[in-house]
Amino acid sequence: MFALAQHTARRTLSRQQWTKVVVSAANYSSGSLSSTIRISSIPAPHTGEITVLSLNRPRARNAISTALLGELNTVVEQLHAQGDKSSTRALILTSESDDAFCAGADLKERLTFTEEDTRNFLKTLRHTFTRLSTLPIPTISAISSIAFGGGLELALCTNFRVLASTASIGLPETRLAIIPGGGGTYRLPALIGETRARDLILTGRRVSGEEAYFIGLADRLVQISEQELGEKGVARGRVLEEATAMAKGICEGGPVAIRAAQAAVSGWRDGEGSENKAYERVIPTKDRLEALTAFGEKRKPSFQGR
């Protein structure tokens, strides 16, 4: 689907296989070794695929550099350009590193920026994050470790967040004498409410996976046992497994219906108009008739996305 070569994983993977897959990136991920994002895919139910984007700057804790941002922007724009013709039915953001989902901005690179460089970087960052947040397909972040600053803002751009109990997230920008600049000051309040968002942003404190789930910042919480804590790749594999299960569960629905529902919910502020417009997309589909036929025949429907 993308310019980078892709590797398709098997439809069903055990927990042990997932752990092995995550630890051995070469067996699962694709793309050049110098790539800051690795792209892979998993077959989705019925048709199409679930695309997995793995941030791949382990030495920098996946900090958002100009190069990483450029690659992310390219992938997001390709998905938008493909529209309904895209074979990607859901998107998962994860990490190639046990140590970090994303530590935020690349501060070492930022030290070399002029004020104009900083403004230009933020302009690209905001554009890319907004485009990610408006993709017509379900998007999920899988986080097992740290997601700070721009890393958390990146996760806020996805529809869902799966966190491990080992995760630690926050918006510490005020402690660096700045404020969140990638959407944190408006996406976080929209998600968890103004008061809780103000608490996290003004204090800059870190939040555990459990607290994130409690306040509604995480949609799924994966508990990691004490025994599993010391096992390489396990927490990362577990959240990816849960995120994939969530994506597959979503993709059990009709492809056109999932996109229509995504659009309707995104337009909830428009009320009935958004829903009615989205419903018109599914009425003429063959998948709708297939679902009715399958119900009458007491079998599972087979959707083709048309």
Swiss-Prot record:
GO terms for biological process: fatty acid beta-oxidation. One of its GO terms (molecular function) is isomerase activity. SUPFAM superfamilies: ClpP/crotonase. Substrate binds at residues 103-107, 150. It comes from Zymoseptoria tritici (strain CBS 115943 / IPO323) (Speckled leaf blotch fungus). Belongs to the enoyl-CoA hydratase/isomerase family. It is an enzyme of class 4 (lyase). Its EC number is 4.2.1.17. Keywords: Isomerase, Lyase, Virulence. It catalyses: a (3S)-3-hydroxyacyl-CoA = a (2E)-enoyl-CoA + H2O; a 4-saturated-(3S)-3-hydroxyacyl-CoA = a (3E)-enoyl-CoA + H2O. CDD domains: crotonase-like. Pathway: Siderophore biosynthesis. Enoyl-CoA isomerase/hydratase involved in the biosynthesis of a ferrichrome A-like siderophore which may contribute to organismal virulence. The first step of siderophore biosynthesis is performed by the HMG-CoA synthase (HMGS) MYCGRDRAFT_54740 which catalyzes the generation of HMG-CoA and CoA using acetoacetyl-CoA and acetyl-CoA as substrates. The enoyl-CoA isomerase/hydratase MYCGRDRAFT_76805 then catalyzes the conversion of HMG-CoA to methylglutaconyl-CoA. The acyltransferase MYCGRDRAFT_85486 then fuses methylglutaconyl-CoA with hydroxyornithine to yield methylglutaconyl hydroxyornithine. Coiled coil: none annotated. This is Enoyl-CoA isomerase/hydratase MYCGRDRAFT_76805.
